[in-house]
Amino acid sequence: MSRMKRDGHRGRNFKIRAVFVGVLIVALLAAGYVLGRKWELSQYQEQRGQMSSGFGQIPTIEVEGVTYEQKMNLTTVLLIGTDRRSDEVSEGYRDGGQADFLLLTVVDHDAKTIRQLQIDRDTIAPVSVLGLFGNKAGSRDMQICLAHGYGVDKQERCKNTLASVQALLGGQSIELYVEIPLDGIGALNDLLGGVTVTLLDDFTASDPTMTAGKTLTLTDQQAEILVRSRMSMAVGTNEARMSRQRIFMDAAVPMIRERISENSGFASEMLDSLSPYLTTNMVRGRMINELNKAYHYD
């Protein structure tokens, strides 16, 4: 392999690692919903696969005649970005807003690797729906972003979204979730003193200063415009919006890493600023351990 290819490979691995570290840093700040790690290595779905007879056997799945064993020592995190603000009140059991951003991160502790899958909000998947009085009303195939609309509270909406992603992926288990509302993006941007990006699209329908090709340090409102805008854009596809969301993340994560390296108290400052916005089932101590391990992975 040439040096250029090796350097490119290292660059991609660093970028993936940086994004995951950023996700874990943000997730760490919630520290409010204690679930523990009782599922790890023990709870697996059986759809589209089978469990060999006998206690402790590894689940397998067959694809095109090839049998694969399920990896056991994994940490899986679903990052959910919603189209609601944290102070918006949901009315009823079917008004929880939509999941505009879905990013699944898989950490393989044996292989010491980190892999990501960003899921288009318009993907059709099984969604568990509720009736007017909160009763379970079966499952329907619809846009996966709509799964977040169903639930009695934020935790239940996250779980419903996670269940739809699991179903989309053939019943594979996802252990952890982090939900970030729309104004959480602005809060993160403010904490970092403004994230600097180069705009690849024209946003002047929402902000006359956000012209294509301009390098701009975002205000909180501009950060929300960048990650949310779609219908007002020349290219109004969700694929284009997904690219813009990654532009913001790719710019924000190195800033987070730099702040932490410069100031050991920055994590506490982040906790104070972001914890009111986040919903998660992650435990603070667990996140510290995951962060320390994943920092050295490819």
Predicted regions and their residues:
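Non-catalytic, solvent-exposed segments at the cell envelope interface
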Residues: S2-I25, L29-D298
